[in-house]
Amino acid sequence: MPGITLLGLGPGNPDQLTREAWDVLSSVDEIWLRTRQHPTVDALPPTVDLHSFDELYENGETFDQVYDSIVEKVLELGRRPEGVIYAVPGHPFVAETTCPKIARLARDEGLATVIVEGLSFLEPTFSALGLDPYPRITLFDAIELSTAHVPAFPPDIPVLVAQLYSRLVASEVKMTLGETYPDEHPVRLVHAAGTKDELVEELKLYEIDRSDHIGLLTSLYVPALGEGTSFEAFQEIVAHLRAPDGCPWDREQTHQSLRTHLLEEAYEAIEALDAGDAAGMHEEFGDLLLQIVLHAQIANEEGEFTINSLIKSIYDKIVRRHPHVFGEVQLEGVKGVLQNWEKLKEAERRDNGKKKKGLLGGVPLALPALTQAQEYQDRAARVGFDWPAVEGVLDKVVEEIQEVKNATNETELTEEIGDLFFVLVNLARWKKIDAESALRETNLKFKRRFTFVEQGASQQGRSLSDMTLDEMDALWDEAKGKERGD
C-alpha cells in the first residue's frame, strides 16, 4: 500500500542497527538511501535493490535545493502502491533535514508514515567523549555555523557541532567560533563515533581545520568558555540583584532613580571613546550595558516589557530599516540609505497610527546642543535642504561673525552667537567632523595645558593670580611645545 517508511541506519556500526530496522531491511526489495556514504550501507542485505540521492548532492547548488528535491522525490515514491523505504544515517529525526519535512507533508496529504528508530550519532559521540550531556549542552549544525558572522549560542554552555564534513567547513567554523572563543581554546574532534574507526582528537580551536581525519562522520565538541561569559548569565545575575535575597540598593531602584546613573555612564563611555582608550571603553560599555539590563529587569517586574521583547523589537527594526541588506531593495550610497531610512520611519509611524512627527521631531531635546544642531542639519540635508557647496557655508561663517560684531545689545548678541555656533556646526558636518567631539577634544586640550600652567606656577612657589599674562602665556607655550615634542 502507499506510504513512507523513514528508517534510521544508526551511526555507522552495522551491529548497532535496531532489530526493527534489520527486519524491515530484510523484508523489502528496494531501499532509497539519502546517501551511500555511510558505513552501514555495505552491510545491508545483498538482495535489496539500493538507490541513492548522491547525484543530487553532486549537481545541486545549495543544500536547501538538494533537500527539497529529495523530499519531493520521496513523496512521489511514497504515492506508489508499494510505497517507499527511505533510509538515512543515524536517527530519522536527529540532525536530519529531510525526514521532518517528509513526515509533515505526508501527513498533510494523508499519506501513511512509519518511523523506524535508529541510534543517532549523539549516543556514541557522548560515549567517545566520556561525557554526560545532562543537564545541558547545545547542538549546532556546522553548515549553519560556517555561514554565520558570530556563534548564535551562549558560550558558557558546551557545544556539539555536527556534520563537520570537510576541512573547508572546519575552517569556516573555526573563523566563526573565533569571534567568541580564544584561538587556544581546547576542543575535541570526534570521528566515526561508535565504529571501528572511531577517533577523538584533542586540539586547540585554531588547529581544527588541520586534521587529516575530517569526514562525513566528524563532529566538534567545544567546552564551555567559563562562568559569566554569556548574556543570559549576565541577565541572571542582574535579576538576582533585584531578588528578595539580592542587594538592598538595587532592589529599591526605579527607572527614574537610575536616570542620573544612565546619563553618567553614557558620558563616561563617550569620554573613553573620545580618548581612544580601549580598556576604558571595555569597562564603560560594560557599565552602560548594566544600566540597560537593569532597566529591562525593572520593566519586566513591572509588566512593561522584557529584555527579550526589547531585543526582538530592535532586531525587527534593523531588518525592516535595511531592505538593501536583508531584502531586494537597491539604494545608491549612504545618502540613498539615509533618505530611505526616513521614508521607512514615517511609514512605520503611519502604520502604527501615530501622527506625522516631522523630520526633526525624532531628535531628542535632551541632546547636547552641538550634537542636536548637527543632527538637525544632517536630517535636513537628507531631503536636499543644504548648501550646494561648502563655500556657501564658509561665506555664512564670515557673515555670522560680522553680525556678532554688529550686535548692539545682549539679546542680539545672544542670538547672533547662537547663529554663529550653528553655522560652525554645519561647517563641521560638511567636513565630516563631529562637532561635539571636536569641542570636547579642545576642552580636554585646554584643561591639559592649563593644568600644566598651574603646576608650573606651583613649582615656582607662586599662585596664578600673582602672575602676569605674559608669564602665564610663556608656560602655556611651553605646554604646547611639550605636546609637539619640542
Functional labels for PLM-detected ranges:
Residues 2-7, 23, 30-36, 79, ...:
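Beta-strand/loop-alpha-helix module characteristic of Rossmann-like adenine-cofactor folds
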Residues 1-116:
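Class I S-adenosyl-L-methionine
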Residues 262-270, 278-300, 304, 308-316, ...:
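An amphipathic alpha-helical micro-motif enriched in hydrophobic residues
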Residues 325:
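Conserved phosphoryl-transfer catalytic core
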